[in-house]
Amino acid sequence: HGLGLLIIDYLQLITTTKNFDSMVNQVTEISRSLKGLARELNVPVIALSQLNRSVETRGGRPRLSDLRDSGSIEQDADVVMFIHRDKESESQIAEILIEKHRNGATGMVELVFDGSKTTFIEVEKRDFADFAADAAGSGNGFVDDNF
């Protein structure tokens, strides 16, 4: 069947045969190499990346500038998405933030996180009130401290 998708977990763990004078230069090379590999193999590459610590001290949603070790991640990627959930919130709502999309729109999608199954569930806006009422009284397995 062949290769249909390549997932890297995570970018900063990849080692190279060449020695670089900084992690920034190494991640830049890895990012560009993955972009070339995607073109060569004609498959999508999903590369997870660490964020720098500024997002923790600043609070709020992550930004493109929070990608750790290199601006080339932002530059090379066709799409950059973040998963964000307010740690202070009691809600199981998680946000998928589409911060860059070379060929499409950016924006946000809200999903419900089911910690007992480690899955995200799409919920339409009109269902949020019903979901909140059910989650509060039914013991349906949605646990908000597993994310």
Where are these regions (language model features)?
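Helical hairpin unit composed of two closely spaced alpha helices linked by a short loop
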Residues: L3-A47
